[in-house]
C-alpha cells in the first residue's frame, strides 16, 4: 500500500514538472515569436497542455495523499481546456480581420492556391488580392518596424 502511494506521488510530481516545463516553453514562445498568430498558437497549445498536466498532477496528489477528490479541480480542468482554445481563436480571428501583421518567411504568393479547395472560382486571385490588402494595411500601421 505504501509503495503504490509513493508511485502515484511520483507520477503526480512528474506531471507537475512536465506541466511547468511546458509552461516555460510556452512563455519562451510568446516572447520569441514575431506576430499575434504565432504567439497565440504558442500561448494556447502549450499552455492548455501545461495546465492539463499540472491539474491532473495536483488531482492525483490530493487523491493519493489526502483521500480528497476535488470537484473544483476537475471542473477547472474541463473549463480551461474548453475555453482557452476558443478564446484564442476569437483573438486570432479578430486580429486577422483587423489586418494585424502576419509573419511570412517569403512573400511569394504563387503557391497560395494549395490552401483553397478546388471548386472555388478565382480563388488564387482573391487570395492574392487579400494578401496585398493585408500587406498595404500592415505597411500603413507598422511603417516604423
From Swiss-Prot:
Gene Ontology CC entries for this record: plasma membrane
Keywords tagged on the record: Antiport, Cell membrane, Ion transport, Membrane, Transmembrane, Transmembrane helix, Transport
MF (Gene Ontology): sodium:proton antiporter activity
Transmembrane segments: 11-31, 51-71, 72-92
One Pfam short name: PhaG_MnhG_YufB
Protein origin, superkingdom: Bacteria
Keyword Zinc: no
Location of the protein in the cell: Cell membrane
Membrane protein topology class: Multi-pass membrane protein
Assembly, per entry: May form a heterooligomeric complex that consists of seven subunits: mnhA2, mnhB2, mnhC2, mnhD2, mnhE2, mnhF2 and mnhG2.
Similarity section: Belongs to the CPA3 antiporters (TC 2.A.63) subunit G family.
Cited NCBIfam families: CPA3_mnhG_phaG, PRK12586.1, PRK12674.1-2
Record protein name field: Putative antiporter subunit mnhG2
Originating species: Staphylococcus aureus (strain bovine RF122 / ET3-1)
Lineage, broadest ranks: Bacteria, Bacillati, Bacillota, Bacilli, Bacillales
Gene giving rise to this polypeptide: mnhG2
